[in-house]
Amino acid sequence: MSVGLSLVVAWVMTVSASFSGATEQDLWYRITIRDAPCGYLHETVRESPTRIRTESLEHLRIDRGGTVVVLSQGTTFEEDPRGTPLFATVRIDTGGRPVRHEYDFPEGLPRNRSPESGMQPVREDAGDGWLTPSEVRAFLKARIAAGATRVTYRTLDPYAGMRPLRIELTYVGSERREVLGRTLELGRWRMQSDGSSIPVEELRTAEGILVSSVADVGLGMMTVELVDRETALQALDAPPPELLDATLVPIRNMVGRTDDAVTAGYRVFFETDRPWELPDSGSQHVRTLRSGGFEVTIDAASGSPASAKELADPALLSASAYIDIDDPGVRRFFRELESTPGDTTLEACDRLRVAVARHVSNKTFGVAFGSASDALRSRSGDCTEHAVLLAAGFRLAGLPARIATGLVHAPASGFEHGAFAWHMWTQVLIDGVWWDFDATRKNRFDAGHLLVSTSSLDGGTGERALSEMLLLLGRMRVEVICVDGLVLDEKTTDGRGDGR
């Protein structure tokens, strides 16, 4: 989930650091997680007679189970002095081939210019009611100067395919603090958006410049603090925080391993302000409980019907930045795999799964999120690389496929009954039915999985899904009811104890 962390940092900065009253700015921020410096963000604004250019660049170093991963991403946004949007770019580097999205704005609507997007408007719902970066800066400065205690507006989220994002800031007080050698009176604001259930506490100058931002991102407290350039860059030299253990979901009752388990029952509870729903898809069937949680039944030997919308979704067969089926090497790899006459489609798909598992022979956390072609060439990766390469094989076979994100049960040091770890696998559509395939496990699929979301990974949907998953870290509870008929919890299905 390291790329999800990177995207949450980017989201915080999308709705925070771009606020400034200056026409020219050069701001450096240090990023810390659990008090450990781990990266920086650099934002600049440059003006010419015809254009205003806002740029941000972020670098992070984190430890994933003893492997240090370096992540970087950045955005640019160009507009004219009247606030007319002209051009924007998003670049994400998670250890594989960098992903780049380019947008223009015909008739004010963002359009993805990447080849796989088909040059179509990506957000018909954006409309005219959103603000560009320079408009946000001017709007916030004016509202603060007017003594406003609540500020609300809409902008575009570049890390979610230019999805409209509603921001609300509430004034909660003031404090004096030394900032870059000067003592300033700062406003304390609480920021929330419709894209996240995580509240962010901010300090801002009277001109709207962000001085600090603090949020509990599930892995611990994350702080983004205005500093000088040297201090910001030094954050990359410090020992990075170890984050893998913080993503584990403990369980108090479970069989030793679930690799061969076919059926299981769970209760799942979300401890968030925002309501969450679990998908009823593939091997997973969900029932809402009166207590507000969910009863989840897994039958790894079964699938579930697709909706009419899913059956008609062209993105499930198309090339994307991560599932790059237009790559010659990827096409050649799957074309040269031997087929077995008489195989059913399900059996043929499982042969693709085994081929991917064997090819990605270097199981490593060193790549946060590589593409299918990255996984093919490097033969390295974790669950994400296995999932996208297998999805590419399915799509090249003419079968709609998507990425599943959720939890998988696995042994974990310090956890008597193992733990659930965040995970990715692949779903494929066969004769109108979704089937689950996990190229990192011994069998096609097993009952040690819990599905939280699915994504075609087209445009910005993959990044959005990953960042949303991070919002659940530390806010999700799982209880095991039974595995392969063995009852492990005698509570009623509502989790309220024996009701007899």
Placement of each model-derived feature along the sequence:
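Hydrophobic ligand-binding cavity/cleft-lining segments
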Residues: 129
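Hydrophobic/aromatic-rich core segments of domains that either
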Residues: 186-188, 196, 202, 386-475
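Bacterial N-terminal signal peptides
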Residues: 4-16
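Secondary-structure boundary elements
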Residues: 136-137, 302-381, 389, 458, ...
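Catalytic-site/binding-pocket detector for metal-dependent nucleotidyl cyclases
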Residues: 132, 138-140
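Flexible, glycine-rich surface segments
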Residues: 149, 158-160, 358-413, 422
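Acidic, serine/threonine-rich low-complexity disordered tracts
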Residues: 18-116, 124-126, 141-303, 443, ...
